């Protein structure tokens, strides 16, 4: 186990992917929970309306993004392994201003529509990231590599995302009132540039570090 862990974190590309995937999960879990609250507080939707809108529009968008990410990785990475992560990196950078616009507009229907494309783009990293992780280590360490990414996503993403989003929202109430969640989401939208940067950094290391695939 110790040898596998050392091998996994001895790869700079893996470390960059680990950071990017964990931070993406942090933002995704936080936005996923509090976007529903945002539509209720800011746009006046009922719990049922907000939940249904998110489930149909953003749920389907997430599925499309996951499939599209794998397809684009296969296409762009066929001749150059560095491009396995090009689509996720570029997509997340493009998603940031679109997310901000979705949280900014006053019409909830326009907001939902604007959130669909960035949701697709932000979900596109799953397949490429896990594929790269498997190729960065020997077969004996692949299970450990995948489990470390899942561990980071759950600890940082699920464990901290919703909690910190909620704490920040509470802190902003004196300033923003019922729009406090909206302001947290404004910030979260632009923070998507961070995982985009780390996926890009990882892509620069892939050609040198990939052991297989």
Which role fits each region the language model picked out?
Residues 96-105, 186-213:
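Multi-pass alpha-helical transporter architecture, strongest
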Residues 74-91:
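Cytoplasmic membrane-interface "Motif A"-like loop-to-helix N-cap segments
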Residues 109-126:
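Hydrophobic core of transmembrane alpha-helices in multi-pass small-molecule transporters
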Residues 39-40, 72-73, 77, 164-174:
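Interfacial helix-cap and linker-helix signal at transmembrane-aqueous boundaries
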Residues 66, 136-174:
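A late C-terminal transmembrane helix in Major Facilitator Superfamily
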Residues 18, 51-52, 89, 143-148:
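Conserved glycine-rich helix-kink/hinge and helix-boundary motifs of the Major Facilitator Superfamily
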Residues 6-69, 122-130, 157-165:
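Extracytoplasmic gate region of multi-pass secondary transporters
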Residues 46, 83-86, 169-190:
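A membrane-interface helix-boundary motif in multi-pass transporters
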